[in-house]
Structure formats: structure tokens, C-alpha cells
Amino acid sequence: MSPYSAFIYNILTMGLIFPWTYLWAPGALPGGRLVWGILLAMIFEIPIALAYVWLSTALPRSGGDYVFQSRVFGGGIGFSIVMSGFVIWILQWVALSGWLLSYLGFASLFLGLGGTMGNPTLTSIGVWFTTPWGIIIVSILNALLAMLLLVSGFKNYVKFQYVMWYATLLSFGLMLYLFFSATPETFAQKLNDFVVASGGAPNFYETAINAAKGANIDLNPPFSLLATLLVAPIAWTSLQWASYSAQQNGEIKGARSFQNQLVIILGSLIVTGLLLAALAAAFEHAIGTNFLYVAGAGYWAGLAEGKFNGVFLWPNILAMALAGSPIIVVIISLGYILNAFQIVNNCYIGMTRVMVAMSLDRLLPEWVSRVSDRLHTPVNAHLAYFLASIPVILVYNLWGQWTALTLGVTFACGYVFIVTALAGALMPYRAKALYGASPGAAYKVGSIPMVTIFGLIGALVGGVMVLMFMFYSALGLTSVLAYQVGSASWRCRSFGISWPE
């Protein structure tokens, strides 16, 4: 994998298609500003990203967070933190990637074709992809295809990643164009036409606006600084993954280069943050502030009139309504389909590398790290992770309470990022030889290593982000179930420390 491939890998991993911020934030946080919240999340992630740059150049090995933490804090801590927060919880991302593929990919494709071609049958097919078993079938096939691709050789994934990258960029660019070239007035008419062509009732836009007002939803709330600050943790669900390429550092050419890692990690963060903020600005420009809160109410408050055929009004659906063209629908959908497929691939790539590193340190069974003589890939690790994902996919789609914890993965993975940032801060003191031989050792502020400064700031910022999820109900993780899951994760962590090194 070249540095450029790693750079686009991180952008795809952060997910240009991730939709939650655009509906969750206006629904749960009236008065918050989407664009500023996303930009704040990007700024807050910078010190964490920089800590990963220093760690990656000091330890350019596959295994990422586990390697960083275990070499600074010891194998027991590294194993328990990364196993509980990453290896186990990223199984949730396997389920999420299937949801993204089925709901935002295939469902949007057929809903869009139904609306632009005036074919209610296609619309009905699209609705099926939003049902639990529709999503389950797509999710398992998605995970299986990713496993087969990766087992065939990492180079095959890298080649296909370029297809996913350019398709996603084209899709994203088209959406920006459609939104920036529209006005709320033209949007209202085109949305109404789109819904009628799909077999729906006329005047969808006006009906939704009136229903929101009838439900006492403020469609033009005053600016709220607190709400804007709370948008940042939602956007962080995407931007926190800027450093994910570190899991396969050993397979990135020039991974020890400080400049390369700055581009791969920090560069991908800034590009993704700016693109997501641009989409937020374009989205609100096209549909208007009033309808933004209607769409948010459909997602957060369950406003029935704020949905289209029971489907939330995601940016890609509304872009298709604006386009009115089956060709544009296919192009936008293809980007979403391929970026969703990339998500499950990165789950396997990152976690199999972590599992192999743990196995080589004798913290997982030896068979986990066996590499196929013919395929030159860790087949056993891939197969184990695929099988482990199936029950998670089933629970995610069949148990509504678990679905409510969709982004609980942000909390669990968040504490991994915090501990890794601390590992960066303490590396000059607890792993002196490693740090002294690294390119980053030359950068100091006075006598204080810069990685210590960035690592401490990053750990503090990450801690604040995680605590916001725990204490603000608008972020969705204050239920009894959420605390039970968090407690179980902590018990798993504590159990892991007792494993022999």
C-alpha cells in the first residue's frame, strides 16, 4: 500500500457517506450549527492524529493501537484495552456497514429509481432493503464478499480501493453540485414531484412542515453554543478514524517517514473534515433551515411525516429528488454502495492485523496468526472475525434496544484512542529507545517532546468527547442498557489484564 493509498483508505474509513450528523444533530440539538460543529470535531481530533503520527513513525508495524499501547504500557494493558474497545466493538461496525450498504446504498438506489422513473414497484423493492431481514441478508453477503476479497490478497483490495475512491468522490461531488445549485423553493417542488412519482401523496413538503409545527418542533431555533459544541461528538463518530491506517503500518511503503504519516493521518483528517462541512453547508442551503429540522425530527423524534416511505430523509435521497434523473441516481448510489463496502473491508483489515500481532505476542492462540502459504494472508483471522460478526449482525437488526446503541461504538473505541494518545505522550519516558530512534524525536518545545504535548491534549479532548456521550441524552448513550454495555466492556478489559505476557 502506497502512502496515497493509505491516505484515501483513511478518508473512506472516516466515511464521506456517514449520514448521522446531518439528521441527528438538527433533530436532537436545535440551535446547533452543523458546519461549525463538524469543523470543531476536526480541530479537536488534530492532537490525537498528531500523536498517532509520532507513534506510527516510531513503530511502523502492523497491529497499530495494540502495538503502540503494549510497547509503552505492557502487553496486558495493550491487549485488554484494544481487545475490548476495538476487536470486539468493531464487530458493530461490520453490522453498521451492512446497514449502510442496504439502507443508504441499495434502498436509496431503488427508491431513487422509483421516484425518477415513476415506478412504484422499484420503490417497493427499495423499501424491502430497509427491513430487518433485507439488511441482514445484505450484511452477511457484504461481510462474506469482503472476507473473500481480502483473503485473496491485500494487493487485490488495494487495486479495488481506487474504484471505490473515485466512485465515492464522483457521488459526493454530484451531491455538492445539486445542493449548492438548488434553493429551498425549487427543492420543495422537486421533492413533491419525486414523492408523487413514487406513488406517494401530493404536497409532501408542505405536509411535513405542518406536521412538525403541529408537534411543537421549533423550525427556526435561535443559535445555541452548547448545541453547536455537542454537534462535535456526533461528527467525531466519523473523524476519530483518521488514524485507522496505523493498524497496517507494516504494509504501508515509507511508513517510517514523518512526512508520509502527516499526509496519511493529518492530511486525510483535514480533507474529510472540510468535505463533510461543505456537504452540511450545501445540504442546508438546498433544503432550508426549516426543512432541515423537519428531516431531523423524522430521525430523532419519530415524526412520521418527516420520512419518505418510512425512510429517513438522508442527504443522498434528497439529492436524488433534486436530480430527477435515473442516471444521477445510479451514480450517487454507486458511491454509497462502494464506500459502504469499503467500511467492512477496513474492519477486517485493521482487526485481523491487531489479532495477528496479539497472537505473535502469545496473547491469542497461535493459529490466529498463521499465514496461508498459497495466499500469503492471515486466513484464520479473517474467518474468525467473519464468523464472530454474524451474531452481531443478527442482534443489531432484530433487537431494537441494541440498534439504539448504534454509535455506542464511538464510546468503546473512544477510550482506545484516549489510551493510545497517552501512550504517545509517555513514549519518550517509558519507551526511550524506541522514541530516541524515531524521526519525531527531533521535535521539541524547549525540553518537552512535542508528542508529549499533543498526546496529553489529545487524551484530554478524547476524554471530553467520550464523557459527552455518557452524560448528554441528546447523544443517545445515557440509557440503562448503554451503561450495562459499558460496564461489560470494562469487565472484559479487566479480565484481559490477567492474561500472561
Q: How would you label these PLM feature ranges?
A:
Residues 1-35, 45-50, 194-200, 500-501:
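Membrane-interface "cap" regions at the ends of multi-pass membrane proteins
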Residues 36, 168-171, 175-177, 182-183, ...:
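A generic transmembrane alpha-helix motif of multi-pass inner-membrane proteins
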Residues 67-74, 111-112, 199-218, 264-344, ...:
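TM-loop-TM module centered on a large, flexible mid-protein loop between adjacent transmembrane helices
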Residues 131-134, 163, 371-376, 417-474, ...:
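C-terminal membrane-solvent junction of multi-pass transporters and transport-like membrane proteins
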